[in-house]
Amino acid sequence: MAWWKAWVEQEGVSVKGSSHFNPDPDAETLYKAMKGIGTNEQAIIDVLTKRSNVQRQQIAKSFKAQFGKDLTETLKSELSGKFERLIVALMYPPYSYEAKELHDAMKGLGTKEGVIIEILASRTKNQLREIMKAYEEDYGSTLEEDIQGDTSGYLERILVCLLQGSRDDVSGFVDPGLVLQDAQALHEAGEKIMGTDEMKFITILCTRSATHLMRVFEEYEKIANKCIEDSIKSETHGSLEEAMLTVVKCTRNVHSYFAERLYYAMKGAGTRDGTLIRNIVSRSEIDLNLIKGQFKKMYGKTLSSMIMADTSGYYKTALLNLVGTDL
């Protein structure tokens, strides 16, 4: 299923929240779990991983009203490491969390281009608008300004272009003439010439609807005798290549894209915990169940089995709760 439909797939939600919800006893449970010496991590997991984000925000309000403390700050003071990072991520409203991930990717020395590419290429126009709004409210500068200040060249161009969210046309109408024109233009901008006309690639990939692009990719393959992915790999490199390939992957099947992100976050030595946490938290109330299905199809194992083998302790328990049972 293509990326633009993922936001409306109710069956994809792995964290549905509590049907008999009352924030006051939940807040009290959390207070007791962190009161005095020691922390009852399991109690924290049982509450926060089994509530929706809206419910968590209500728990935080109740916690403040009952005990005069900020819940997120209290959690930060009681927890540590990857487990703290995961639990704190759950406490952010969704758009503020995405804004934070983008801000963290750009602050300090170096830029985590992969995080920026992942978020901007896989979100819809409405989602991007809300993320930009949250970013400006939380950090006092616009996301576009910060991206322009932190990146350069064609990578900056494609990221700013993605921010405009022009790929959201879900009308289903596709102009066959324009499809052929775009496929030929991509061929002429890459395979047919010495060098590459990067702006032509950027313009078509970032401003056409997903339904249109799917047809363009088909026509391109007929003209070039190779898939668009192979042409991008041979014509570009580095972060620009990653950005273009991500747009193509998300256009073809967003669930496959996120399955791949999760798989490579755990494959091999070490774990890319930032990628693992961000994608499980941000997709848990959208389409994580659908991602799990693609994961099993693509890699022959379940997402939860890989998490069990690659993580440990309360961090593992919390992740598995968010992922839910494998289908």
Curated annotation (Swiss-Prot):
Record family assignment: Belongs to the annexin family.
InterPro entries associated with the record: Annexin, Annexin_repeat, Annexin_repeat_CS, Annexin_sf, ANX8
GO BP term, pick one: blood coagulation
Gene Ontology molecular function, alphabetical: calcium ion binding; calcium-dependent phospholipid binding
Superkingdom assignment: Eukaryota
Name under which the protein is recorded: Annexin A8
Record text about domains: A pair of annexin repeats may form one binding site for calcium and phospholipid.
Keyword match Repeat: yes
UniProt keywords, alphabetically: Annexin, Blood coagulation, Calcium, Calcium/phospholipid-binding, Hemostasis, Metal-binding, Repeat
Role this protein plays: This protein is an anticoagulant protein that acts as an indirect inhibitor of the thromboplastin-specific complex, which is involved in the blood coagulation cascade.
Record PROSITE patterns: ANNEXIN_1, ANNEXIN_2
SUPFAM superfamilies: Annexin (SSF47874)
